């Protein structure tokens, strides 16, 4: 049986030297250890249960879900974002340390979905509140599509420059269109419609004698005549 012999490397061998830049090293460390903050408000968020399971196992990409925005550098938004939830989403994003990334998951998050047609309280796209790096359409997106979006984000991180990423992005943020509300008189103020309580003067009155002289049910036409 032949034993395995390892080659003896000379100390002057050029292949033993790794040359890189500080920017590439920083990008490699960040793309290999993304800590996401899972922000779900609707049905698309259920797909994360499949990702955490053993079949897809998104832990192999170094993703460790965090419950605090101060410990996360990636936020995955899934579901409909309403006007009431918009301030909390912006606050969570602002509490995340730089550099930070956003993946918009699902049609309701990207465009408002079916709720954006007639709803007055739905934000028409999460990019009106926070900047989005990767858009992931679907209703809901499959777990394979979520993994593909994470792979695209990792490639984007590998090509970026750190100084450009941490540059303030307040000027790039745009907010949703202001909704116009008109003040109208409330119908429940105690002023009832008098026409519903009191009949018009043209209606003929029915006397008590005429009403009680009929022992059998009669029509209203007979009572009036």
From Swiss-Prot:
Keywords annotated in UniProt: 4Fe-4S, Chloroplast, Iron, Iron-sulfur, Membrane, Metal-binding, NAD, NADP, Plastid, Plastoquinone, Quinone, Thylakoid, Translocase, Transport
Gene3D superfamilies: 3.40.50.12280
SUPFAM superfamilies cross-referenced by the UniProt entry: HydA/Nqo6-like
Pfam families associated with the record: Oxidored_q6
InterPro entries per UniProt: NADH_UbQ_OxRdtase-like_20kDa, NADH_UQ_OxRdtase_20Kd_su
One GO BP: photosynthesis, light reaction
Enzyme Commission designation: 7.1.1.-
One annotated GO molecular function: quinone binding
Subunit structure comment from the entry: NDH is composed of at least 16 different subunits, 5 of which are encoded in the nucleus.
Full protein name: NAD(P)H-quinone oxidoreductase subunit K, chloroplastic
Organism: Arabidopsis thaliana
Upper classification of the organism: Eukaryota, Viridiplantae, Streptophyta, Embryophyta, Tracheophyta
Gene: ndhK
């Amino acid at each position: 049986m032949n034993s395995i012999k390892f080659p003896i490397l000379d100390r002057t061998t050029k292949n033993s030297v790794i040359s890189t830049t500080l920017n590439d090293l920083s990008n490699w460390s960040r793309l290999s250890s993304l800590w996401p903050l899972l922000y779900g408000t609707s049905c698309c968020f259920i797909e994360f249960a499949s990702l955490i399971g053993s079949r897809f196992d998104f832990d192999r990409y170094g993703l460790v879900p965090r419950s605090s925005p101060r410990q996360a550098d990636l936020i995955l938004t899934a579901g409909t974002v309403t006007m009431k939830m918009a301030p909390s989403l912006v606050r969570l994003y602002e509490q995340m340390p730089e550099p930070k990334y956003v993946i918009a998951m699902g049609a309701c998050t990207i465009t408002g979905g079916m709720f954006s047609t007639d709803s007055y309280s739905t934000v028409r796209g999460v990019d009106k509140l926070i900047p989005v790096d990767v858009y992931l359409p679907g209703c809901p997106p499959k777990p394979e599509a979520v993994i593909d979006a994470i792979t695209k984000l990792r490639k984007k991180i590998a090509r970026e420059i750190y100084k450009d990423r941490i540059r303030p992005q307040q000027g790039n943020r745009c907010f949703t269109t202001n909704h116009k509300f008109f003040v109208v008189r409330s119908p429940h103020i105690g002023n009832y419609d008098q026409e519903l309580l009191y009949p018009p003067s043209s209606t003929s009155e029915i006397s008590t004698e005429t009403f009680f002289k009929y022992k059998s049910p009669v029509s209203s036409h007979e009572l009036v005549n």
